[in-house]
């Protein structure tokens, strides 16, 4: 189990399906530390499809096995104990793209 996570860290996680039935082990991006939980979004190898998708330019630096897409449309709060392994961190360029899109689309 991980006690401290940081915005921009990439972990392998048991990510629940939207239906609530089952899960898949996949990389996730940490968006927010919520003490016992954290807010994450999924990372997929499926190419960019929507306005809340961002291509990871420096995917190898982030610890990803292949070119990947961050899906800010797929947010979920997970218990830190299901984070299996920190595999990397977003490069500054990718980190700034995520931060900009987050601030633009989720500003309340």
Model-derived segments and spans:
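Compact nucleic-acid interaction/catalytic patches
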Residues: 19-25, 30-60
């Amino acid at each position: 189990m991980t006690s401290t996570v940081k915005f921009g860290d990439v972990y392998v996680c048991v990510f629940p399906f939207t239906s609530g039935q089952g899960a898949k082990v996949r990389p996730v991006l940490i968006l927010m530390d919520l003490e016992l939980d954290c807010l994450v979004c999924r990372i997929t190898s499926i190419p960019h499809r929507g306005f809340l998708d961002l291509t990871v330019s420096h995917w190898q630096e982030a610890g990803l096995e292949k070119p990947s897409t961050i899906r800010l449309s797929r947010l979920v709060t997970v218990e830190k104990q299901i984070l299996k392994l920190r595999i990397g961190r977003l490069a500054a360029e990718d980190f700034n793209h995520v931060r900009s899109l987050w601030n633009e689309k989720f500003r309340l």
